């Protein structure tokens, strides 16, 4: 009893510290009213399911909350706009303070958000969002964004979806966009049906329209909304996203250099879309997917977690239900999905360890998936992230398994058995000298009769792990024609059949003549559907060989300065790509190689050359006699190749011609197009005329006029 009293008093002390000078800054009239209302309440019994420390905070907050909602109701009835704004501000302050509380923040905030609904506050907010007074609409939407916990999302989906959809039509209202994009971010987590309803009524169109903008708050909400739609919306919503070119519009977000959280959620969204085999090729074609791995490899999970802890939206981390949606990426076949899911789990482990809640990862099954990656994956980035996550979870990190399974001796088989949890059978496997060859040919009958694996479920577990091993194994020593990759191209799961086919004498040349019966009896492909798909793939016409003729070059090469021109360059890429142009834009990649040669070759092979002239874009070219600057090299290559050069300016001041090296000074004679963020479609139409019509350098007089504009400003 004494111990309980001590614990309770310590929680009260922690609660009182909330009201120190470190509290969030709010309008003075709100602070004074809150101070008057927050008198210490009498001790009350703890509500069922709520811990004492959570109840202690609620006892101080709920009276003020009830008072604010009463004020909100009365001021709405009387039409007192100033009093309405005060009540909304008080409620917002209580909610925001709850979300940033350490340890108990999520539980306190959820109780407060639910209480707002139960006391009628949510209904009032939906009504206020329809009033003619725009300031009330703005502030009501801002508060609604903060209180959309699970039960409140249910209410809005049933009673207020029309209100939200009406607000999404106000695409040009920048202040409203900040809140409505946040509301959509939450609502795309609700159900597949709600997401589909939002998409079919224009909400996704609005999100994609806002992806063109520059407001970091709106862009962050858009990135998270798209990742939520992809993760929680199911196959139907993923198909709708592809039809509306969401994969393409994710490119500017993933390419952004301004905000890592924007890039991260954009990469997560495109990785989830690519995990759907039905639309994988369309996602790959967008070009966004190749941004994922280099970006993730450049991040530090601990630093990223600290940034999330600084954000009120993310500081509590994700729930178990949210994290479970990462498992299909971890267990999938796309490297990008594994990479971003492993990184996300590292970040969440860092947050959950502060909350002393790392057991959540064992409960959702993430630990086994991470161990499988460590054992089998050959990608250094994914492997290191999986190891790091396991260490932070205080889990055992398994050893990397040698990939040349056909060449395994019995010792390697023993190691593998121990790491997958079948050490009880190690002795029997050792007695029978089971090596890699025998392991790859093992059948369920062998497990029962020779290896003593009598339990049916145990055999299923073993065969499941064996399928994973067969899928990851390297067959190069026995598969000279690379049948393994051909099977994986038909379906990544079919790689497990490689050894059986190769041992039976099948290769890429004669597979077209194989029958269903031969696949079953000789190659041991027992799944009839798999046999049908393999035979169908074998009878498809082979792809034309391009070794003799070089593939066609891109329609457009986009040259830009990374520090200031990334966003405009990425927008141009998407606009042109959606209009049927093939576009090359330099993307930072991990693989080594002759980078300079590849880049110059791309300029030479392109028909058009768009030069993005953002702020200070040519500064590094000045005095660059040795041509070490990349933009300088690209411009000179385009000039020498007589490309159709189209400069696009954005906050750019044309330099003195004498300040540029002589080999690129003629670039100043080209007619440039001034970019307009507000009228992007009109600007793109002008660029299209330049690309499809005569070269821009034929109009030097127009160029001189255009170049004077920024200086006049």
From Swiss-Prot:
Residues 408-472, 478-537 form the SAM domain. This is NAD(+) hydrolase SARM1. Belongs to the SARM1 family. It holds the Pfam family SAM_2. The active site is at residue 634. It catalyses: NAD(+) + H2O = ADP-D-ribose + nicotinamide + H(+); NAD(+) = cyclic ADP-beta-D-ribose + nicotinamide + H(+); NADP(+) + H2O = ADP-D-ribose 2'-phosphate + nicotinamide + H(+). Keywords: Cell projection, Cytoplasm, Differentiation, Hydrolase, Immunity, Innate immunity, Mitochondrion, NAD, Neurogenesis, Phosphoprotein, Repeat, Synapse, Transit peptide. NAD(+) 1 binds at residues 99, 106, 145-153, 186-189. Disruption phenotype: Absence of sarm1 provides a level of protection against axon degeneration. Schwann cells are protected from chemotoxicity by delaying axon degeneration. Absence of Sarm1 does not promote axon resealing. ARM repeats lie at residues 53-96, 110-149, 151-189, 192-231, 233-276, 277-310, 311-350, 355-398. NAD(+) 2 binds at residues 561-562, 591. Homooctamer; forms an octameric ring via SAM domains. The keyword Nucleotide-binding does not apply. The TIR domain mediates NAD(+) hydrolase (NADase) activity. Self-association of TIR domains is required for NADase activity. The ARM repeats inhibit the NAD(+) hydrolase (NADase) activity by binding to NAD(+): NAD(+)-binding to ARM repeats facilitates inhibition of the TIR domain NADase through their domain interface. In contrast to classical ARM repeats, the last helix of ARM 6 does not fold back to interact with the first two helices, but instead turns towards the N-terminus of SARM1. As a result, the two following motifs ARM 7 and ARM 8 reverse their directions and lie perpendicularly. Moreover, ARM repeats interact with different domains not only within each protomer but also of the adjacent ones. SUPFAM superfamilies: ARM repeat (SSF48371), SAM/Pointed domain (SSF47769), Toll/Interleukin receptor TIR domain (SSF52200). Its EC number is 3.2.2.6, 3.2.2.-. One of its GO terms (cellular component) is dendrite. GO terms for biological process: cell differentiation; innate immune response; NAD catabolic process; negative regulation of MyD88-independent toll-like receptor signaling pathway; nervous system development; regulation of axon regeneration; response to axon injury; signal transduction. Autoinhibited: in the inactive state, the enzymatic TIR domain is held apart by the autoinhibiting ARM repeats. NAD(+)-binding to ARM repeats maintains an inactive state by promoting interaction between ARM repeats and the TIR domain, thereby facilitating inhibition of the enzymatic TIR domain. Following activation, possibly by nicotinamide mononucleotide (NMN), auto-inhibitory interactions are released, allowing self-association of the TIR domains and subsequent activation of the NAD(+) hydrolase (NADase) activity. Self-association of TIR domains is facilitated by the octamer of SAM domains. InterPro entries: ARM-like, ARM-type_fold, SAM, SAM/pointed_sf, SARM1, TIR_dom, Toll_tir_struct_dom_sf. GO terms for molecular function: NAD+ nucleosidase activity; NAD+ nucleosidase activity, cyclic ADP-ribose generating; NADP+ nucleosidase activity; signaling adaptor activity. NAD(+) hydrolase, which plays a key role in axonal degeneration following injury by regulating NAD(+) metabolism. Acts as a negative regulator of MYD88- and TRIF-dependent toll-like receptor signaling pathway by promoting Wallerian degeneration, an injury-induced form of programmed subcellular death which involves degeneration of an axon distal to the injury site.
């Amino acid at each position: 009893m004494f111990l309980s009293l001590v614990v309770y008093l310590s929680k009260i002390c922690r609660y009182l510290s909330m009201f120190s000078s470190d509290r969030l800054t709010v309008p003075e009239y709100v602070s004074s009213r809150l101070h008057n209302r927050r008198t210490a309440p009498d001790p009350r019994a703890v509500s069922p399911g709520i811990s004492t420390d959570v109840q202690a905070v609620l006892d101080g907050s709920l009276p003020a909350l009830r008072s604010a909602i009463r004020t909100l109701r009365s001021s709405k009835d009387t039409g007192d706009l100033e009093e309405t704004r005060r009540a909304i501000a008080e409620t917002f302050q209580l909610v925001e303070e709850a979300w940033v509380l350490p340890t108990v923040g999520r539980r306190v905030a959820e109780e407060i958000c639910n209480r707002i609904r139960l006391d009628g506050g949510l209904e009032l907010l939906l009504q206020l969002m329809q009033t003619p007074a725009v300031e009330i609409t703005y502030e009501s939407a801002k508060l609604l964004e903060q209180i959309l916990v699970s039960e409140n999302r249910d209410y809005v989906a049933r009673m207020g979806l029309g209100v939200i959809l009406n607000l999404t039509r106000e695409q040009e209202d920048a202040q409203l966009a900040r809140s409505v994009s946040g509301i959509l971010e939450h609502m795309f987590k609700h159900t597949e049906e709600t997401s589909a309803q939002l998409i079919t009524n224009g909400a996704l169109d609005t999100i994609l329209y806002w992806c063109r903008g520059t407001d970091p708050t709106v862009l962050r909400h858009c990135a998270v909304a798209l990742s939520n739609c992809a993760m929680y919306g199911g196959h139907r919503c993923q198909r709708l996203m592809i039809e509306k070119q969401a994969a393409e519009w994710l490119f500017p977000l993933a390419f952004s250099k301004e905000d890592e959280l924007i890039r991260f959620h954009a990469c997560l969204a495109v990785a989830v879309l690519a995990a759907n085999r039905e639309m994988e090729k369309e996602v790959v074609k967008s070009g966004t997917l190749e941004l994922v791995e280099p970006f993730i490899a450049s991040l530090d999970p601990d630093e990223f977690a600290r940034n999330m802890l600084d954000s009120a939206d993310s500081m509590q981390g994700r729930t178990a239900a949210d994290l479970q949606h990462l498992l299909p990426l971890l267990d999938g076949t796309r490297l990008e999905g594994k990479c971003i899911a492993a990184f996300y789990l590292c970040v969440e482990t860092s947050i959950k360890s502060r909350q002393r809640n790392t057991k959540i990862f064992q409960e959702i099954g993430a630990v086994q998936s991470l161990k499988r990656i460590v054992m089998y994956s050959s990608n250094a980035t994914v492997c290191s992230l999986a190891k790091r996550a396991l260490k932070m979870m205080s889990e055992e990190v398994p050893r990397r398994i040698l990939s040349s399974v056909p060449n395994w001796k019995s010792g390697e088989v023993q190691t593998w058995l121990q790491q997958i949890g079948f050490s009880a059978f190690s002795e029997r496997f050792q007695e029978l000298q089971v090596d890699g060859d025998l392991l790859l040919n093992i059948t369920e009958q062998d497990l029962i009769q020779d290896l003593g694996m009598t339990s049916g479920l145990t055999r299923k577990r073993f065969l499941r792990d064996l399928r994973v091993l067969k899928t990851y194994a390297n067959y190069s020593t026995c598969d000279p024609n690379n049948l393994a990759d051909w099977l994986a191209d038909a379906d990544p799961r079919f790689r497990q059949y490689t050894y059986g086919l190769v041992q039976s004498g099948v290769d890429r040349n004669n597979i077209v003549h194989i029958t269903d019966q031969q696949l079953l009896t000789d190659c041991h492909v027992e799944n009839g559907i798999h046999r049908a798909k393999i035979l169908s793939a074998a009878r498809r016409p082979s792809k034309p060989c391009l070794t003799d003729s070089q593939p066609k070059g891109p329609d457009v090469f986009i040259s830009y300065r990374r520090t200031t021109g990334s966003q405009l360059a990425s927008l141009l890429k998407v606009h042109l790509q959606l209009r049927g142009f093939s576009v090359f834009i330099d993307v930072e990649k991990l693989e080594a190689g002759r980078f300079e040669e590849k880049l110059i070759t791309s300029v030479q092979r392109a028909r058009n050359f768009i030069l993005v002239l953002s702020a200070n874009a040519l500064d590094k070219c000045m005095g660059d006699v040795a041509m070490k600057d990349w933009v300088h090299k690209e411009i000179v290559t385009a000039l020498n190749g007589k490309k159709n050069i189209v400069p696009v300016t954005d906050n750019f001041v044309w330099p003195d011609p004498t300040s540029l090296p002589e080999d690129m000074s003629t670039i100043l004679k080209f007619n440039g197009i001034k970019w307009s963020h507000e009228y992007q479609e009109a600007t793109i139409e002008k660029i299209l005329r330049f690309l499809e019509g005569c070269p821009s350098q034929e109009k030097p007089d127009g160029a001189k006029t255009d170049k004077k504009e920024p200086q006049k400003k």
